[in-house]
Amino acid sequence: MRFWRDGLGFTELFGHTFTGDWPELFGAQTNELRSVFLGDPQMPDTGIVELVAFEGANEALPVPAGPRHGFFLLSLQRDVNETLSALAALGFTDGVRRITVAAPAGKTVPMAVITAPDGVVVELIGPAR
């Protein structure tokens, strides 16, 4: 949770352990899952990230060297330098890559990716300057 909360600045909006037929729905090995909803309570229209954990789940697959087919990352608008510094201070530096992309009106947009501890690739998109 430190990666998502302390590093990326999300607030835990709601957390609960749900009981259901998760083996049928997800192919899980348990009927219990832990669900945590993260977001910004001051800006609820910016979206919510749900983290789901199953007890006894298999280890995460290795992160591939390149993009996977289909959805492969979570993209967030954040100050790139500040966010990467906050994550590094917490010990999170896996998979960091940075670029700058040309934008309209002669501006540039800083971008970076970092791999979360659970293997999710997170893209950071900074403001155009």
PLM regions: where:
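Core segments of cupin and vicinal oxygen chelate
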Residues: M1-D45, E82, A105-K107
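Short, structured motif recognition centered on aromatic/hydrophobic residues
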Residues: W4, T46-L51, F71, V122-L124
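Vicinal oxygen chelate
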Residues: G15, F37, V49-E50, L76, ...
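Short glycine-biased active-site loop of nucleotidyltransferases that positions the nucleotide triphosphate
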Residues: F26-T30, V63-P64, V113
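Short, charged/polar, Gly/Pro-enriched secondary-structure boundary elements
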Residues: P44-T46, E59-A60, G119-V120
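Acetyl-CoA-dependent GNAT
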Residues: A53-G56
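Long, charged/polar, surface-exposed segments that mediate recognition or autoinhibition
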Residues: P62-P67, S85
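Eukaryotic phosphotyrosine signaling hubs
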Residues: P67-L73
